[in-house]
């Protein structure tokens, strides 16, 4: 202690000496400014100027003054206020405040404010007092009160001092809420008392309103309380159901189900249970139910009663009234739903039963019941034939089908004309054409089937590869003609026959339903019988034969006309040979068809249907005079021109009372396209080189000329020569090479080396020839008029 006092005396003496000593040299204010400026320029000194520039201060001293301001303001200082108090730029204050907060862990920079631990401890004490007063507090309330960020309050204030300064606990479901244990105990007491007083289902919202407890606290404390009841859910419309009430519900449901083996949803809903199906599943976990729209049937009622009764009904071939075995309070809709559900679960075969107004009939029972109606159907069919009603129906139906076919043809032709017009507009004005100007393949909604026609061999005895067929009209157009269905059996007739049997069982009220059920079936049986009787009449057979031959002849004449256009593109000599071949093949078919028809009309016996010229002449001389001259003239016309043959054929058709169809040139393109498609299909299936070349030549001719051609294999060279100008040199060389190899194979021995080499080369070139024929197109296609 004495040494300290001596030290104080020595310092006082030094201080007195300094005061008494006079300054050797005083500096003026200007000199001081210059010295400071020089130090600043040489960066030997760092100062901070005030806002007015009249004063300056070192950063370290400014930092001390900021800390003094923090202390003077109780541990929380707003940097804007500090800047105004110290008369220093705010940016300087902020920079130093950040340095202070970074260097001192006890100081925090929050939203432009410096806050130290003393202030944090102070507000923690305030929070603790408020929590003790209210019992619960949230971070959002504290943020509003202290004007501080909620994250800062939660992490650096509340959670940091929780259990120390702040006496409370954090809500597990909501970390931003804190409460005291005493508050929790008060809430538990309120909840326990309220739930103990409830004897019927009560809305949770009503309970919370009465006891003034928050919903989240109610649900979090409910499990800890273990009340004598349960809450239906945690949603807004949740209810609290006391166990005593739930037990009463369960006892009633169990008792009702035990007595009746079914449960009504409405009855369960009246007990205060909203989801009846879920409640039933929960109440009877080991029971199987058939859940319907209004009721739930137990498995015992379904299996032991209904299914057993249905099986017995099927075995005895009788009927079953379901109202006698099902509960009386089930409506007809419920009973029908029960039956449908049982059939859907395949407890029994659905095809064995018919359900009508709560009555289930076995199929054999109904079959036996309507058995007399089949005799009625046959009688009605015979009466319709005898009276001509069915014949009139057939005629009207045929006319309607022809009318629909004509509408479809007009529609298809109109579409085809529009497509042609669009193609012409698109191609007009274009020079050349190239790949962009090629002909577009037109699809038709009508299908033409061209029958195979066996062509006779010409002088070179070569096989023909052309196959023509009869064409059938496709579906109808928009204005279809309909024929009223012919009902040979009436509902009243069926009711009259089955009513007597139903009256014995007291089921006469079901007669109209059963009659309607079998009306269509009996009508179809009657129509089938009428058709059978109709086809059995000789007159009908003759009329059908007449119509079929007329259609075939017209088809062949159209084919000849189309082939004639194609052969006219060749030279005169080749054209003459093609005409001769055409008449020997298709013309011969026409003569045979008509000769056989006339022989049938004249009751002449013909052993062989493939007739030659001499046989046809002999047959014509034996037939009636009205046919004789026309048939003889037609046979002679086979060696003349196509026009002569067509005129002779028209005479024969006139004698046979057959009609020649009017030429419809609009259909030509469709027929040509169909013919080409058939040739292409044959080409894809063909493996024989000679036939393949023949088909390829015909397809290329059709593509290039737009016409079809009926030619045998000997005309392949002429066809290739004709289309030569439309193909490239490479394509021509390939076809000629393939043609030469085919001739080599035909002219050499099959087992020779030359033949084998030629076969190998043909196999290599085959795909190229097929590809050329299938994919070749031209910008413009020349067509015969």
Swiss-Prot record:
Show the segment(s) annotated as Disordered: 405-483
What is one Gene Ontology biological process annotated in the Swiss-Prot or TrEMBL record? protein K69-linked ufmylation
Keywords, comma-separated and alphabetical = Transferase, Ubl conjugation pathway
Q: Name one GO cellular component term.
A: endoplasmic reticulum membrane
Q: Which GO terms describe its molecular function?
A: UFM1 ligase activity
EC number in record = 2.3.2.-
Q: Which residues form the signal peptide?
A: none
One Pfam entry for this protein is UFL1_C
Q: Does the entry feature the keyword Transferase, yes or no?
A: yes
- What's the superkingdom here? Eukaryota
Enzyme class at the top of the EC tree: transferase
Q: What does this protein do?
A: E3 UFM1-protein ligase that mediates ufmylation of target proteins.
Which family does the entry's similarity section mention? Belongs to the UFL1 family.
**Can you name this protein?**
E3 UFM1-protein ligase 1 homolog
Record the organism: Drosophila pseudoobscura pseudoobscura (Fruit fly)
Q: What is the lineage of its organism?
A: Eukaryota, Metazoa, Ecdysozoa, Arthropoda, Hexapoda
